């Protein structure tokens, strides 16, 4: 059977896909056919994804118009402080499209004012309930009653954007700083957009990262959900501040040349009915699958039916909304694995290609993800999309027309698991260097990946950050700069080495969760009944990194230098990594990338004098040393020391380097010239 030439290119790159070519072809056809059906062959996806400009509350031609989709409803009232929160026929919506279930009301301008609260009272056969509009752009919670309502946001002086988005030329690689606005503050409280802009954004800029990934932006009723139980998909989280304050945050980041991407939660929705979409019109199936498939048992949330026209309209419009309204520069799609598989991939190892091409795959979800990427890149060609998938689904970060699903990047989610296993289960002297190298570089070459040693996942309560796994409770008593405890020294050394080799072998991007760059202690535990609603573990102790008398600043300084070198030498823009030396017993790895030489000695106590390995001919200068005293090391190498390759007999054309490799350390060398030391040396 012949396939589309572009699909054939994918099959040629990965022969294992050949047995499933007919499924790939069918999925690709489904994407094209769904796009044709949604756009009716006339308007493009960019127009189709403008549902947020039709539904919801809008000021149009001197008055207000509100529309909602509720096909099972038989009566809907707009209620709020403008009508004493009572049903009033003056505020009754009328059904304007019986077949589609679209409702509308038009009101004079004077009816509604800035910051008015409102909601819907929806009646359906056999029942009724209050609901927050599905397209509400601002939702607030009353501090006393804890009740959520939609709020009209129409200030007299709306926010005016001051700075352009970063240029497309800066997109060749990503250094991502993952952050949560609410827990970004030092004080034990919920932080705000304004505080983040003033206090945290400058730290990110100084640290050298070029992209901020903001978590928990979509409105969510329960703060402790980390933002993953979304109720109002078009509303920015109000507990952090106003829409204008979020825009100012994004604008300030753009002024500094930073991209801002956000976590986009389209994998599920909160099960709350009043605040969320569940049983919005009295049915369980309006937005979600009916029956057990519509409920995520592990997350206690609702699962979207990606095969429904109006669900696609809602979610695709949501993608466009955040680009248009808040000028976000892209998205990290959360929970993609849960979307892809009917069983959500729970408890599966994904050891065979058959796992990606059987009846357990939700092909409607694949179609949605492909169309979402098409919408995003149509609205903003330079936008960044990242897939969080732990299953390894082939093609997620491949072009749609080549049988992929259009993401720009995918997370290398096996890397943090690798580090946890090695630290937790294997003594240092038995670390499998060959396996380490394989896993760090195990990725589909045609798909861009983002690596990380740890993210927010590893910092949550019940888990441990890398630094805490390495040092443990000694962090509380032995992090003074002059303290010389062996366990602490080991932890600091490995923390730097782990992060350096993860970045140096990353595909096209690197991610760090806020605070991990300086070894922030302890896990994250949001306020909850079990901890007395305390914020003590839902904050960042920046003062630890600012204190010169503590060791934390060594890690922060090292990370800043490491990120700076990666940016200066465009490390992640050069995907090729060339292995020069791998030795299991010596615990040595040496490799070249972007003209830089990376040398690692993971041996816990054995230093290697006069250690030789082949390298590109030239003169090399050390530009980063994990063992430098300025980074809390022992200073066993000479700063800025230069080394020349030489060609020992019998082959004068086979240059080698001879280096001193201190134990449990790593360094980076820049090739400053192609000039070698020509005099032959004795072996």
State the predicted function of each range.
Residues 68, 120, 179, 204, ...:
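Conserved, mostly hydrophobic/aromatic
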Residues 541, 548-569:
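Catalytic cores of secreted or luminal carbohydrate-active enzymes
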Residues 1-61, 65, 86-88, 92-178, ...:
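The feature marks proteins involved in alpha-glucan
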Residues 140, 158, 162-174, 180-361, ...:
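Substrate-binding/active-site clefts of carbohydrate-active enzymes
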Residues 562, 613-644:
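C-terminal accessory region downstream of the catalytic core in glycan-modifying enzymes
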Residues 114-118, 640-683:
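C-terminal beta-strand-rich structural cap/linker in extracellular carbohydrate-active enzymes
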Residues 144-148, 327-329, 347-538, 567-612, ...:
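Conserved alpha/beta catalytic core and glycan-binding cleft of carbohydrate-active enzymes
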Residues 66-70, 76-80, 603-619:
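Surface-exposed beta-strand/loop patches in extracellular or lumenal glycoproteins
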């Amino acid at each position: 059977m012949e396939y589309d030439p572009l699909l054939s290119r994918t099959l040629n790159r990965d022969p294992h896909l050949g047995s499933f070519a007919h499924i790939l072809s069918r999925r690709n056809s489904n994407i094209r056919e769904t796009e044709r059906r949604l756009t009716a062959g006339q308007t493009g996806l960019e127009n189709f994804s403008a549902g947020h400009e039709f539904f919801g509350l809008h000021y149009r031609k001197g008055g207000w118009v509100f529309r909602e989709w509720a096909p099972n409803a038989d009566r809907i009232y707009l209620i709020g402080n403008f009508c004493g929160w009572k049903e009033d026929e003056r505020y009754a919506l009328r059904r304007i499209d019986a077949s589609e279930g679209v409702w509308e009301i038009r009101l004079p301008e004077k009816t509604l004012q800035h910051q008015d609260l409102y909601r819907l009272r929806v009646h359906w056969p056999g029942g009724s309930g209050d609901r927050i509009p599905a397209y509400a752009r601002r939702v607030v919670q009353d501090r006393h009653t804890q009740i959520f309502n939609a709020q009209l946001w129409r200030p007299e002086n709306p926010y005016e954007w001051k700075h352009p988005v970063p240029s497309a030329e800066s997109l060749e690689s990503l250094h991502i700083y993952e952050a949560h606005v609410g827990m970004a503050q030092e004080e034990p409280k919920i932080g705000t957009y304004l505080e983040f802009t003033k206090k945290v954004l400058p730290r990110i800029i100084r640290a050298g990262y070029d992209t901020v990934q903001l978590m928990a932006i979509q409105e969510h009723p329960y703060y402790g959900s980390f933002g993953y139980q979304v109720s109002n998909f078009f509303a920015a989280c109000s507990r952090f501040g106003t829409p204008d304050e979020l825009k100012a945050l994004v604008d300030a980041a753009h002024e500094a040349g930073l991209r801002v991407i956000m976590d986009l939660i389209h994998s599920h929705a909160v099960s709350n009915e009043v605040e969320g979409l569940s049983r919005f019109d009295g049915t369980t199936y309006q937005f979600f699958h009916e029956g057990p498939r519509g409920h995520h048992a592990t997350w206690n949330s609702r699962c979207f039916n990606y095969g429904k026209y109006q669900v696609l309209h809602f979610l695709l419009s949501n993608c466009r909304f955040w680009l248009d309204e808040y000028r976000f520069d892209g998205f990290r799609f959360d929970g993609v694995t849960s979307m892809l598989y009917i069983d959500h991939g729970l408890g599966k190892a994904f050891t065979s290609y058959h796992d990606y091409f059987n009846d357990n795959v939700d092909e409607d979800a694949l179609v949605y993800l492909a169309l979402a990427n098409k919408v995003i890149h149509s609205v903003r060609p330079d936008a960044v999309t990242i897939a969080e998938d732990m299953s390894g689904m082939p093609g997620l970060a491949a072009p749609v027309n080549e049988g992929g699903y259009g993401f720009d990047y995918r997370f290398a989610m096996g890397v943090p698991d690798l580090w946890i296993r090695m630290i937790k289960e294997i003594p240092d002297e038995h670390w499998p260097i060959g396996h380490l190298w394989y896993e760090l570089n195990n990725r589909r070459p045609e798909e861009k990946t983002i690596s990380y040693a740890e993210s927010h996942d590893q910092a949550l309560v019940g888990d441990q950050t890398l630094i805490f796994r390495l040092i443990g409770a000694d962090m509380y008593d032995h992090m003074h700069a002059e303290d010389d405890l062996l366990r602490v020294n080991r932890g600091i050394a490995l923390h730097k080495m782990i992060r350096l080799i993860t970045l140096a072998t990353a595909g096209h991007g690197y991610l760090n969760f806020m605070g991990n760059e300086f070894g922030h202690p302890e896990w994250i535990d949001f306020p909850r009944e079990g901890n007395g609603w305390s914020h003590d573990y839902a904050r960042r102790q920046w003062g630890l990194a600012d204190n010169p008398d503590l060791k934390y600043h060594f890690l922060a300084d090292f990370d800043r230098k490491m990120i700076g070198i990666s940016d200066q030498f465009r490390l992640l823009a050069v995907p090729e990594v060339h292995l020069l030396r791998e030795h299991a017993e010596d615990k040595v790895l040496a490799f070249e990338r972007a003209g830089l030489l990376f040398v690692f000695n993971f041996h816990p106590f054995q230093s290697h004098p006069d250690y030789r390995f082949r390298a590109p001919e030239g003169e090399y200068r050390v530009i980063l040393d994990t063992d430098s005293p300025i980074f809390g090391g022992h200073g066993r190498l000479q700063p800025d020391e230069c080394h020349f390759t030489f060609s020992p007999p019998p082959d004068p054309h086979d240059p080698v380097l001879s280096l001193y490799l201190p134990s449990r350390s790593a360094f980076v060398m820049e090739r400053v010239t192609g000039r070698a030391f020509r005099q032959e040396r004795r072996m």
